Amino acid sequence: HYHLKTPLLDWSHSFFVALYFAFEDLEPEQEKYRVIYQLNDFLPPEQDVIITPKIKIGARINSQNGVFTKLTSYHLEELASYNRPEYLGKGVPFISKYLISSKLRMDVLNFLASINIDPYTIYPDLLGKMKACEIGIDNAIAEINLEYQD
């Protein structure tokens, strides 16, 4: 969205890309957990919520393996109500929520970088270069803070 507000919510077919987005920002470290939602592709036909662009609209959506939904928090809760045995079929819930400790931020980002998931690959443009610099600065500050704690 290039930081424009839209009614669309970004999703990725890649767990690792979702993990990157969950840990990208430094600020939520005050929060105990980062959250990743998993939306099942095999929703009931009346729940046509996943929007896949017919044409690739830019390098970002390609590199992020992205799709969109037009869901409010109310709609997410409604989908969660389908997580009942009579709807589950093969036992796969329609929406799942994963909580991961915010304390793992640097470990997660370092792991993702080791498998080539970083700002350069997520944002293959100038923003990616800027975000890579920000993460480098965050890392340097975190290391300095650790030295002062010892």
Annotate the PLM regions.
Residues H1-D150:
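Catalytic-core elements of nucleic-acid end-processing and repair enzymes
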